[in-house]
């Protein structure tokens, strides 16, 4: 089984948290709301990977003013690729508390939507298991 280290930013701006709705046809949690993030590449430092993933998935304009390592978790997930292939992967999630100076987001093809969500509204979103676990640990659910 392949192993991947995943960096995930929990991005907050003015009391709201950024959630992204995964594309329906790919990923580990198709069609569900999640944190952004992705894999650390070989030879890449963790914070470099986090900043790269944010640029790739959320655009160049989102300005982070704080990045603080917060927690980690792990599990085994089945990833669905755009061509329909499936793969079981051991995932290690490194989660960061982040503060954004703005809300200028431009999502890539991995997502179909995004939202800045106040903590009291998080219960109204179809959150994936990993995101739900993270938000519970943070005391937001």
Curated annotation (Swiss-Prot):
| PROSITE patterns membership | NUDIX (PS51462), NUDIX_BOX (PS00893)
Location of the motif Nudix box: 38-59
InterPro entries for the chain: Nucleoside_triphosphatase_NudI, Nudix_hydrolase, NUDIX_hydrolase-like_dom_sf, NUDIX_hydrolase_CS, NUDIX_hydrolase_dom
The transmembrane segments are none
Does the keyword Aminoacyl-tRNA synthetase belong to this entry? no
Keyword Magnesium listed: yes
In terms of Pfam families, this protein maps to: NUDIX (PF00293)
Alphabetized, the UniProt keywords read: Hydrolase, Magnesium
**Domain named Nudix hydrolase: which ranges?**
1-141
Q: So which domain of life are we looking at?
A: Bacteria
Cofactor(s) it depends on: Mg(2+)
Subunit-level organization? Monomer.
| Family to which this protein belongs | Belongs to the Nudix hydrolase family. NudI subfamily.
Q: Which NCBIfam families match?
A: PRK15472.1
Name it.
Nucleoside triphosphatase NudI
Which species? Escherichia coli O139:H28 (strain E24377A / ETEC)
């Amino acid at each position: 089984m392949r192993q991947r280290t995943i960096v995930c930013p929990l991005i907050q701006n003015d009391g709201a948290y950024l959630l992204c709705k995964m594309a329906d046809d790919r990923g580990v949690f198709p069609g569900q709301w999640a944190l952004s993030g992705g894999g650390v590449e070989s030879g890449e430092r963790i914070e470099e990977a986090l900043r790269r993933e944010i640029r790739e998935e959320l655009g160049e304009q989102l300005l982070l003013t704080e990045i603080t390592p917060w927690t980690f978790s792990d599990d085994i997930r089945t990833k669905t690729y755009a061509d329909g292939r499936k793969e079981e992967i051991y995932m290690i999630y490194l989660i960061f508390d982040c503060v954004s100076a703005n809300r200028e987001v431009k999502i890539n093809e991995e997502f179909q939507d995004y939202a800045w969500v106040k903590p009291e509204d998080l219960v109204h979103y179809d959150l994936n298991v990993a995101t739900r676990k993270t938000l519970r640990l943070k005391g937001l659910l």
